[in-house]
């Protein structure tokens, strides 16, 4: 079985060719203002046009609200990856598959952070 690969943090249109050539399964686009990899909608859409149709596009967010989820869905992402705190509104608004990234300092935190699922 081949592992699936996501290349994340794309910043410019030229990055799309790298993702295409590398054979990645997923391309990650960061939407978090505190990140140096943060993109505007316009930047992301320009890069997305150059991504091969076989590569799934992942919107990476931190503590998104329902409005941000709806905007990302309009942009034709395939998956939404959420970090941070999740609101019930954001989860309810998500009509796409959701990946929830959890940072743990010890295994006991897993149950506490995932009991709402």
Where are these regions (language model features)?
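Conserved N-terminal beta1-alpha1 strand-loop-helix module at the mouth
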Residues: 1-117
